[in-house]
Amino acid sequence: PIIAIITIILTTGFNGHLMANYTEVYMSGFANFIKNYFPLFMTGAIFAKLMEEANYAKSIAHFITQKLGKDKSILAVVLSGALLTYGGVSLFVVAFILYPIASMLFKEADIPKRLIPGTIALGAFTFTMTALPGSPEIQNVIPMKYFGTDTFAAPIIGIVASVMMLTLGMLWLTKRAKSAKVNGEGYGNHSDKSIETDYSNLPNIFSAILPIIIIFVTNLFFSKVYYENIDGSYLSEFGTTLSSVSGTWSVIIAIVLADVFIVLTNLKKIKNLKSILDIGVTNSFRPLLNSSAIVGYGSVIKSLAVFGVIQSFIFGISSNPIISEALSVNLICGLTASASGGLGISLDALAPTYLHMSQALNISPEILHRIASLSSGGLDTLPH
């Protein structure tokens, strides 16, 4: 809000109706993002906490790394992170779970410890976040509201992009590891006692992976079967359409069912359910409020006269909506240092125009969805 107020002062002076812009513009954008995505953030955070408490996430990561072994340490960590995040486990939980496993494997394979962050990031923060069809990550969910799509939008583009990200990422990490070995650099003399983890008494892999299968199958069923065959005209009373909300509803239902499944199958193991739910809900607040604050700031920018200049510049880059969208989403995500917040700002301001342009060129809204999602994972990782 402070940056929004400063922006108003810089562009309109002290006659810019600061409080009106704060309560009616900034807070409207802020609250609207929460209205649209709080259920997703909350259910997803609870799911991540339940997967952690039931040791399902640890079991999946341990199973993959054991099967691939130390000779394929980098690939093992990448695939573990990919499967967990594709299943809906939050990025932060995945990093926490994978770090001790990666440390153990890298030490055995004598791979530099400094490559662990990049290895975890490739599996957890790249193709499953923005590219892989069906991913419940928020960066793949936000475009649905604007383009009337679902999480499986443009599957071929998504799969091709995923393969490219995985392949190029693995090539780079492997090259760095080999280069380090040639230079005589190994894991190093690091004391890792503090990150030792007990992997005994983990649940079997079938039980651990079932919640992820439930999310995928349920999301697919509701997105492609159930909501495709019902009459959504009643939603006109609520000022929306079925195509705008069905994708989000499908993901919410899928995650809730997975949450319920974990609880019911771990009644003896999960001792304090209320505490776990409290922590899960609390964990959802920070990323939700951060993204909402950024989107609120975007609402203020959109209301200013200078936005017309920005909009003209963006659309002047290319008359092709795909190219223009890719550049604008990347740019705004880079400026805000947030994939979800920048994506929300971009699409809230520009999606209607892109949709109109794509219709004139006979471009499917699914392609716009996938390009927007992919672009959100670009410049958001700049050092700032």
Annotate each language-model stretch with its function.
Residues 25-58, 83, 243-308:
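Core transmembrane alpha-helical segments of multi-pass membrane transporters/permeases
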Residues 104-209, 368-371, 377-384:
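Membrane-core helix-loop-helix motifs of multi-pass transport proteins
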Residues 16, 132-143, 148, 220-232, ...:
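Membrane-helix interface motif
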Residues 31-38, 64-79, 109-116, 153, ...:
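Membrane-interfacial loop-to-helix junctions in multi-pass transporters
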Residues 1, 34-37, 48-58, 85-97, ...:
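Short helix-coil transition sites and intra-membrane helix breaks within transmembrane domains
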Residues 4-13, 41-46, 80-85, 123-127, ...:
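Hydrophobic core segments of alpha-helical transmembrane domains in multi-pass membrane transport
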Residues 38-44, 67-104, 288-298, 315-356:
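Hydrophobic alpha-helical transmembrane segments of multi-pass integral membrane proteins
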